[in-house]
Amino acid sequence: MRLDAGRSLWLLILALTAVRLWAAAVIPLTEDEAYYRLWSQHLHFGYYDHPPMIAWWIWLGTTLAGDTPLGVRLLPVLGAAVTTWLTADLARRLGGGARTALLAALAYNAMLTIGAGGLIATPDAPAILFWAATLAVLGRIATGGSPRLWLLAGLTAGLACISKYSALFLAPGVFLWLLSTAENRRRLATPWPWSAVGVAGLVFATNLAWNATHGWLTFEKQFGRVEPSQFRPGYLGEFLTTQFVLLNPLIAVLAGVGVWAGMRSRGRVGRLDLSLPLLAALPFCLYLAIHSLHDRVQAHWPATVFAAFALAAAAAVEARPRGWRPRVLGGGLILGAAAMAGVLAWAGLQGPPINSRTDPLLPIRGWPQFAGEVEAARVRTGAEWVGVAHYGALSQLAATGRIEAPLVHLIERERWPDAGPAPVDKPGLVLDKSRRLSLADLQACFRSVTPVGELVRGVPTSRVDRYPLFRVEGPVEGLLARGCPDELGKNRRRQAAAPIPPPRGAWPAQRTGGGS
């Protein structure tokens, strides 16, 4: 029996979700995922690095599926499935048929960032979903939907903004779309678009209020990126090259054809009107290009606009259904499927390093065994707490549940607004990668510092991470305010702005189980 495009879309979504659920269950957590997992155990309206949505998602996922990698990633996996459907739905709303919708969904998941990364629990996951949801609602409004849908669009846009601040660029993008045609400009004369702004503002105000009572922690962390610095145009080439690869080179070619055609015809490419997704993406894309003139753009930052490029690729193929374009799309789908299968299988089965110098899986390898060795060293040395210099190491150790004593982050204490008093007045075991921690650092922080060995994490036949161990006693006064290494100046500036409220709990928790 030959499947129609509509049924094929649902089979695609189900198949991809099944694969991602398997991978989510067997691939160990990354450092950032383990970090956000700790957030989820102390729910707030904001955190040091990002708005709160990913913590809420992980809390719900671990409530439903347990404190496991699958629980941490459950909502991101389901979110990727919903985003695929929303992308297909938007293709239909913009003038395409069922086949166009299927092509858009295929192109979207063939993108390397989405195909292999669509299960990772980072703030990008909810931001991508709510950005796509906002466009899907606006697509319904544009095709005759009730004006009351503007309220839903405001809600989804607000949720995108408390997922990741880059979603703030959605507002000027939608405004550009509203200015683009006479019909859209007439919508601005009604109260509905402005009501959407109000709803989005109310949602975002929850995070604003949290920041106002916590020294504007997240704003200082994130918006510090926009400070002017030295002109380095070489980053622009790196940015464009990286995104060309991560979009999937063949899909990127088709997306470029679609975007170019849309620019020449006021957004229309074949039967599809791409003005909404392309104009909505434009301000963020311009910001990323400008940012790349002075600093590096991280590979995952543009992921929220990838659905727009998938729609452009599908439109390019549908506009010329004969010739080279369908063949390029077919090649892109094969490349995307192979890359997704290869990456997920290699990570899920903990495949071997590439060579003696390169092991991309090193950041997620061997944490349970390593934590067991740390705990054994703690017991052997009589330490009553374990200290680290990096949030990722602390988060990974906590996720294993194998450390039977309090874990203490010796710097950046502002990451943990609920942190209770740390027992640093008692003997402790301090460790971290050798490049992050030195004997001299600790001797400035503790009166007694004794090297007690070294632990290694990784595959012996390739590059490994080495962690020197130190037994410490007698902290200097104000150790945690200064940080170790010393961060006193940074903390004093922050505390002068607005002191962090007094501790209200114990974070990180002593026994924070869950496997990685």
Segments predicted by a language model, with ranges:
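Membrane-interface transmembrane helices that cradle and orient dolichyl/undecaprenyl
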Residues: 2, 92-95, 134-150, 257, ...
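Transmembrane-helix motifs of polytopic, lipid-linked glycan transferases
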Residues: 10, 74-95, 110, 133, ...
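Short helix- or helix-capping micro-motifs
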Residues: 13, 101-109, 157, 161, ...
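Transmembrane-lumen/periplasm boundary regions of multi-pass, lipid-linked membrane glycan transferases
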Residues: 19, 159, 171-274, 280-295
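Specific aromatic-rich, kink-prone transmembrane helix
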Residues: 41, 84-86, 126-144, 149-157, ...
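Membrane-interface alpha helices of multi-pass inner-membrane proteins
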Residues: 104-105, 137, 149-165, 199-202, ...
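Short acidic/glycine- and proline-prone juxtamembrane loop motifs at membrane-interface regions
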Residues: 113-127
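Membrane-proximal, lumen/periplasm-facing interface regions of secretory-pathway glyco-
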Residues: 299, 324-382, 391-416, 431-479, ...
